[in-house]
UniProtKB/Swiss-Prot annotation:
Stored Gene3D superfamilies: 1.20.1050.10, Glutaredoxin
Organism: Arabidopsis thaliana (Mouse-ear cress)
Task performed by this protein: Displays a dual function. As a soluble protein, exhibits glutathione-dependent thiol transferase and dehydroascorbate (DHA) reductase activities. Key component of the ascorbate recycling system. Involved in the redox homeostasis, especially in scavenging of ROS under oxidative stresses, subsequently to biotic or abiotic inducers. As a peripheral membrane protein, could also function as voltage-gated ion channel.
Principal localisation: mitochondrion
Catalytic residue list: 20 (nucleophile)
UniProt topology in membrane: Peripheral membrane protein
Molecular function, one GO term: glutathione transferase activity
Induction: Induced by jasmonic acid (JA), oxidative chemical stresses (e.g. norflurazon, menadione, paraquat, and antimycin A), and during photosynthetic operation in the light. Also up-regulated by insects such as Pieris rapae in a JA-dependent manner.
Tissue: Expressed at least in roots and leaves.
Descriptive protein name: Glutathione S-transferase DHAR1, mitochondrial
GO cellular component terms attached to this protein's record: apoplast; chloroplast; chloroplast stroma; cytosol; mitochondrion; monoatomic ion channel complex; nucleus; peroxisome
Free-text comment about domains: May change from a globular, soluble state to a state where the N-terminal domain is inserted into the membrane and functions as ion channel. A conformation change of the N-terminal domain is thought to expose hydrophobic surfaces that trigger membrane insertion.
Length: 213
């Protein structure tokens, strides 16, 4: 029985994959495990009733597995790892939280209108921590030679960071973080990433209402 997954449709383009990094994380996991799945694009500004019936809070992603609909990307990734253990994607516990604060600090900086509020510095601190991890461990991924769950969580978030900050703030990751640059290049060149990424213009249209409410 094929798996089914509900993910965000693009803002203003409901027939295209949208800009939800948590949806892409789930799709990346499905792709890395070479699983067959059917995708449902959900227009989050006009949610169909059948979707609200399976996801009362109206959140994506939602995965149908064993005739049950499961919400939350953390839960989805855990279930897929348990049911389809090959190839293994579980990240060793000591590396599982690497980069976990990047997305939050990115969002704060992106929406900031005050250049002196410390939000840029907070993001740079997190990127420096990622740089130091990558520098002190054999890569190219967080946990070594093989891609794992932490990479699949970070990849969409770093893509959003690159696209949105480049567009709205003309900002990019400093060249003083060469390992982060190489890591992003490695992630973005994965076949699974190419297949599941949204177009840059939809990342921008997705963030626009949050940047300029």
């Amino acid at each position: 029985m094929a798996l089914e997954i509900c993910v965000k449709a693009a803002v203003g383009a409901p027939d295209h994959l949208g800009d939800c990094p948590f949806s892409q994380r789930a799709l990346l996991t499905l792709e890395e495990k070479s699983l067959t799945y059917k995708i449902h694009l959900i227009n989050l500004s006009d949610k169909p009733q059948w979707f609200l019936d399976i996801s009362p809070q109206g959140k994506v992603p939602v995965l149908k597995i064993d005739d049950k609909w499961v919400t939350d990307s953390d839960v989805i990734v855990g279930i897929l790892e348990e049911k389809y253990p090959d190839p293994p994607l579980k990240t060793p516990a000591e590396f599982a939280s690497v980069g976990s604060n990047i997305f939050g600090t990115f969002g704060t900086f992106l929406k900031s209108k005050d250049s002196n509020d410390g939000s840029e510095h907070a993001l740079l601190v997190e990127l420096e921590a990622l740089e130091n991890h990558l520098k002190s461990h054999d890569g190219p991924f967080i946990a070594g030679e093989r891609v794992s769950a932490v990479d699949l969580s970070l990849a969409p978030k770093l893509y959003h960071l690159q696209v949105a900050l480049g567009h709205f703030k003309s900002w990019s990751v400093p060249e003083s973080f060469p390992h982060v640059h190489n890591y992003m290049k490695t992630l973005f060149s994965l076949d699974s990433f190419e297949k599941t990424k949204t177009e840059e213009k939809y990342v921008i249209s997705g963030w626009a209402p949050k940047v300029n409410p």
